[in-house]
Amino acid sequence: MAEKSSKKLWGGRFSGATDPLMAEFNKSIYSGKEMCEEDVIGSMAYAKALCQKNVISEEELNSILKGLEQIQREWNSGQFVLEPSDEDVHTANERRLTEIIGDVAGKLHTGRSRNDQVTTDLRLWLCRKIKEVEVYVINLLKVFTNRAEMEIDVIMSGYTHLQRAQPVRWSHFLMSHALPLLGDLGRLRQLYTRVSQLPLGAGALAGNPFNVDREFLRKELGFEGIIMNSMNAVGDRDFVIEFMFWAGMVMLHISRFAEDLIIYSSSEFGFVTLSDAYSTGSSIMPQKKNPDSLELLRGKSGRVLGDMIGLMITVKGTPTTYNKDLQEDKEPLFDAFKTVSDSLQILTGVVSTLTINPTKIAESLTPDLLATDLAEYLVRKGLPFRQTHHISGSAVRMAEERNTTLDKLSVSDLQSLHPLFDEDVSKVFNYEESVEKRCSIGGTAKHCVQEQIEHIRSAIL
């Protein structure tokens, strides 16, 4: 049965009924109720601003505030009852407020549009959620730094192109993934200020005709600033897209780390073992222990990036100010927030319970990883690096042709490649000394890795 338009907040203009499917299609109540707390808080502040301008009396203000407090309690206790006619959380709250206090509830919307109301709610919600997810990033960084500090003496093969490259500390590898997350933390903190800008008082698009005190509203709601153009205030969703970009970057960083751990946990590598708490088995192969937590983290990164791209495409063709297309911002935002929040917490659990296998890690260290060190040995004796690179490469080929390892070549073998090789060349084939030579800022020497750990710790205080 078609729903009468006259019952709608906007129904006075219409004489015909709304098509039932259109009525459902138009709703955003189930996604929008995520912001029920913010909607009530915003309405309380706006009611006070109206009272300041004598649009409503003190008595009416008190009645509205008491009604809103009851609505707040009903939402918090799960007792708020949604009606089929509720189009969104704003209309649901106004309908319930009217039931509680009568027609005076209709004064609350004076000078206010759902356009500035919804973006106020959304900004308040996102400000709260940014503070929440910030804690999850910090907790993950703490786990990374604690683990790196404890296991700083473990040396492994580093990889480029997924081929063994040079020795590095395990902790250096961990810090290579922690530092991008530290960058994410910085971006999140910068983003907060851009989200924390007041749109309320912008009206539908042209501003508020009752001269409400927007500075009062800013302070009352805890915003850091005020959006200075009313058209921009109601039509802007950059803050949503920017958060979703942030979430996408976090998930990208999580995905790359997850991929490394998936590889390192395989039988072929065996560097790490996941806790049972973050693994699953096979329904047919009893021996299997699958890194499902890591695979899901990798998979969900695509989901969050898809949320961001989808909203950007939705917004890109919309005309200036508010359009109904913008109703489609909430579901991808809420999904991206939940996914990135859950993922950060899951990864924190994975890293904190991970077991490293030092024997397997040590087996990845082979003399060919020190070919660059062999070239640098000759550099220290005065030869140009391009020449020493070629000589070291010839030594690698010689070892391969003799089916032996680089460290097994005799001094005379090496001297046949260049006379500057001497007995002290044996010192090259020491993995600990190799990593300690990489001692400039950002290197894999022990004190450099400790500096990286302290850099992160000082940033998350």
From Swiss-Prot:
Its EC number is 4.3.2.1. The keyword Amino-acid biosynthesis applies. Pathway: Amino-acid biosynthesis; L-arginine biosynthesis; L-arginine from L-ornithine and carbamoyl phosphate: step 3/3. This is Argininosuccinate lyase. InterPro entries: Arg_succ_lyase_C, Argininosuccinate_lyase, Fumarase/histidase_N, Fumarate_lyase_CS, Fumarate_lyase_fam, Fumarate_lyase_N, L-Aspartase-like. The record marks 295 as: Increases basicity of active site His. The keyword Nuclease does not apply. One of its GO terms (cellular component) is cytosol. Homotetramer.
